[in-house]
Each structure stands twice: as structure tokens, then as C-alpha cells.
Amino acid sequence: MCGVYGDPAAGRYTLSIYRYFRTMNPEITLGMNTNGAIQNTAWWQTLGEIFHRQRDYVVFSIDGLENTNHIYRRGVDWNKLMDNVRSYISTGASAHWDMLVYGHNEHQVDACEQLAKDLGFSGFRAKISRRQVRAGLQQPMYWQPLPTMLGPIHCHVLKEKSVYIDAQGRLSPCCWLGGRQQDFITDIEQVRLTWNSDDPNPVCRDACGVTHGQTKFHTQWQREIQLC
């Protein structure tokens, strides 16, 4: 689950949905992206107990330390976030720290990586976002426009054999289609047949830049490491 529309932890039935998925397919990989500031420690401990398989994970989007994380993650209480993180990790479940790097927090990347290691995160990733920087936020000093390259299509959805369900319960092949509400596609076969064609599905072409068997992609990772 990923918050294209809100944070998954805010859902009333999130834990029940994950339990249902596990019941339907005991070998399914479960995952979540979150800012970690919602719910209480008991909720996060329960989630960790559900995420007991090796490949299950939670990505905590934490953009700095106590004095900077709230600048982008509006309204996030640092102490509550840390309590929730510790509660989840205490179950032995896998957690990944995902950090957006801006001018106000670029000096904290090393410290965030060390804190992630100290807390027991299994992975740490610092990245420079391609999203438009809003008022008051600055790109890091070393930032340069990311080069656009052409390469072969390696469809993430095809590799994972995954699907996307949006907040309105609509099924789609890929989360990248989630923002294209006016052209929402539910026919997975329709999309699959156009991935490597000379005339890709128009929504895929818009979302991923797919054209004539190739796709545009950017290098945005500053640092990505496995901690344990």
C-alpha cells in the first residue's frame, strides 16, 4: 500500500485487509509506504506481526531528523514517529528508511543513515525528488537537473506480478496510473499487450514515457544501501 491518496496507516480497515490478503495467499509479499506518524504503538506492533515473511516490508518516509523532518512531512510528531518505528521493528519485521534530500536536510544524510542503522532498519535510501519543489523548499546545493536517458522497458509490474488498487477500490495494473483518473484503466490485458509494442497504451506512455519499445528514466538516487 502506498499513499497516492492519503497514508495507508490512516485506513480504518488496513490491518484487516492485510490479514485478508495473507489468508488468500500465504506466500504473498506485503508492503506499505508511510510517514509513520499515524496510529499508536500497539497498531504498529500488530502490523509487524502480520509482516512476518522475509520479503514483507514497511518504507518509512523520514526526511531528516527531529529538527527538519517536519518541514516537508507537515504535522509529523518526531517522538510519536520514533515510538511507532521502534514498536514495528521490535517484532523483527523489515523496515526501510526513505529520505528525500533538500537544501535544509542535505547535511543530515550521514546522521540519518547512522540512526537508521541504530534503530534496526534493514535499508536506507536517500534520494533527490524530481517533483516540483514547493515554496520554501530548496534543492540541495549539489543538485543538478537529472539527465533523461532512453533504455529498454523493464516493467516493474510485470516483474512483481502485482496490481494496483486505488483508494476508491478500482483495480489497475500499476500505481503510476493512479493519478490519471480521467483515463483510469481496469483492463490489465489491454495494458500488457501494449508494453512492448510500437504503439504503447496512451496512459502508460504519459506516465512512463514509453515509446517504440523504450522508456525514459532518470537517475535520482543519491545513496541506497542495505544495512543488514
Model feature map: region roles:
Residues 104, 124-144, 178:
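Flexible glycine/acidic-rich beta-alpha junction loops that bind and position SAM and/or redox cofactors
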Residues 1-3, 10-115, 119-127:
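Radical SAM/AdoMet-radical enzyme domain recognition
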Residues 139-154, 220-228:
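A C-terminal cap/extension of S-adenosyl-L-methionine-dependent methyltransferases
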Residues 170-228:
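Flexible mid-to-C-terminal extensions adjoining Fe-S/redox cofactors in radical SAM and related proteins
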Residues 156-159:
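Short, small/polar residue-rich loop motifs at catalytic or cofactor-binding pockets
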Residues 162:
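Short hydrophobic/aromatic beta-strand element in the GNAT-like acyltransferase core
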Residues 134-150, 197-204:
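Short, positively charged
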Residues 165-166:
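Short, acidic, Ser/Thr-enriched surface-loop or helix-capping motifs
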